[in-house]
């Protein structure tokens, strides 16, 4: 009996050691989201990318995430917590996480960090972004074709270059169809606030807009469009199920392939901090199926999407600034540095840019 007990204890210990070794062999990849994964928008889409990592890399990885993390001291604590809990690669998915990631990356030099939509790097901190503005040009063209009032309502979060270039690209697309098209802007000073987003949509519709665009994360604005029997666009993910009659298309973010490649690089020992800006041609920016529009508008949108995928830049001159002063000459193309520092509107935007 004593020999049997010793044998059982030895077997249990062996299994425990094997399990510990297996856990140690796994790479822990972690994400920090500014909103809830149930926003069905920006944070949701990043989390879909995390799930794709799990599916693609299987038992090689363990993943974890923190959601609803505020930009500021809360973000400092979130990144430090994940680093202390054994995360080997951490993705911060909001612009406002930039300084917290820089700070925590210095404290944990052996942890790999990546930051979405920012511009600061370090020896163990890379940055990645998507050219959302490419898709917004197509949205602008569709809006100009579908709008009866010639006015779009645009709901936005914070006056950072990514948001400003999106507004401008949308306007350039719209004015390529209707030179007199206008956009009214409402700043809600939040990435995710369904109440504010809904109120903004109602106010814009009351002011004469008949189509709504957003650079915020909830489905609220599009649902208001559905209630008003008007139109709008999904943001970050396909929101058609929330507004089956209102959604014309959605600007969707496809993070999965990028996340898989970066986590695989971490596994292989080949990860290095990088500066990546992916677009339509890379499959990182996509447009959901074109719906609730005539065939000719759909064909136009498809043609423009292909044109951009083939290398055409929406910020190709001639383009004038909001006050009418020339910015880009005929055929001149804005470089990435200019876009990433964009702090002015193009002609046609009905708003004073907050400073």
Regions from the PLM with identified roles:
Residues 1-4:
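Positively charged n-region of N-terminal signal peptides that target proteins for export
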Residues 7-16:
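Bacterial N-terminal signal peptides
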Residues 17-23:
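Sec/Tat signal peptide C-region and signal peptidase I cleavage site
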Residues 24-355:
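A residue-level marker of the well-folded mature domains of exported/periplasmic proteins
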């Amino acid at each position: 009996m004593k020999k049997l007990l010793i044998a059982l204890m030895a077997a249990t210990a062996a299994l425990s050691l094997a399990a510990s070794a297996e856990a140690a062999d796994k790479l822990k990849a972690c994400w920090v989201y500014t909103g809830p994964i149930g926003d069905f928008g920006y944070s949701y889409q990043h989390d879909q990318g995390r799930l794709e990592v799990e599916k693609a890399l299987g038992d090689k990885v363990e993943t974890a995430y923190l959601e609803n993390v505020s930009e500021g001291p809360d973000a400092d604590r979130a990144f430090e917590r994940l680093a202390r809990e054994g995360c080997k690669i951490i993705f911060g998915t909001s612009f406002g996480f930039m300084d917290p990631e820089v700070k925590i990356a210095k404290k944990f030099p052996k942890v790999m960090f990546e930051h979405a939509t920012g511009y600061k790097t370090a020896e163990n901190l890379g940055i990645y972004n998507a050219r959302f503005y490419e898709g917004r040009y197509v949205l602008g063209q569709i809006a100009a074709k579908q709008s009866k009032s010639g006015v779009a309502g645009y709901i936005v979060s914070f006056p950072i270059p990514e948001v400003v270039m999106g507004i401008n690209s949308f306007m350039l697309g719209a004015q390529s169809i209707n030179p007199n098209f206008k956009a009214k802007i409402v700043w809600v000073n939040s990435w995710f606030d369904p109440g504010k987003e809904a109120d903004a949509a109602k106010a814009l519709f009351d002011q004469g807009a008949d189509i709504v665009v957003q650079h915020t994360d909830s489905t609220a604005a599009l649902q208001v469009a559905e209630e008003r029997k008007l139109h709008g666009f999904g943001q970050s993910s396909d929101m058609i199920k929330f507004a089956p009659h209102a959604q014309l298309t959605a600007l969707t973010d496809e993070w999965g392939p990028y996340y898989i490649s970066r986590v695989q690089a971490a596994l292989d020992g080949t990860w290095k901090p990088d500066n990546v800006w992916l677009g339509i041609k890379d499959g990182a920016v996509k447009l959901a199926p074109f719906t609730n529009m005539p065939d000719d508008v759909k064909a136009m949108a498809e043609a423009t999407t292909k044109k951009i995928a083939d290398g055409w830049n929406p910020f190709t001159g001639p383009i004038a600034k909001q006050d009418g002063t020339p910015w880009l000459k005929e055929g001149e193309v804005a470089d990435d540095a200019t876009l990433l520092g964009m702090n002015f509107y193009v002609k046609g935007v009905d708003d004073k840019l907050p400073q």
